Amino acid sequence: MDIRITPRKLNGAVTPPASKSMAHRAVLALALADGQGTLSNLSDSQDIQATKRCVEALKALRPDGALPFLDCGESGSTLRFLIPIALAVSGGGVFTGHGRLMERPQGPYFDIFKEKGIFYEQKDGVLTVQGTLTPGVYRLPGNVSSQFVTGLLYALPLRPGDPTVEL
């Protein structure tokens, strides 16, 4: 097979694929703003679909008072962003995932939960969290994934008081 490449000037426009990281954050920002806005050019990855499903699960009414069931697929971003958001809007959640997602470390959140008296249990591939985000200081090590910081920064303004995140 012969291929000939001829240099020439190109015209047109290219729309690069959206950043998955930014797409997660945009979906959550819109959901927390009561859906007042429009998103376009979002990544349609399985991770973004998982975030959208979890947002819908958080919005669903549960007359029995049960915690929402949040299937995060294989998305670490979805899981780490939504753990504190679920505490802020629903008093907690029951999280599950696929692949090795539920084996990923959540230690920075667990340390906060111990300090704040928030219940958590990780067993058989399911993470249950239940409690209330209260005013005060939320400390995270400076070397943790930005996913932990983002989750807290999205969740804490939804609660009364004047919380602080320290790195």
Regions from the PLM with identified roles:
Residues 1-167:
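Structural preference for solvent-exposed beta-strand-turn elements
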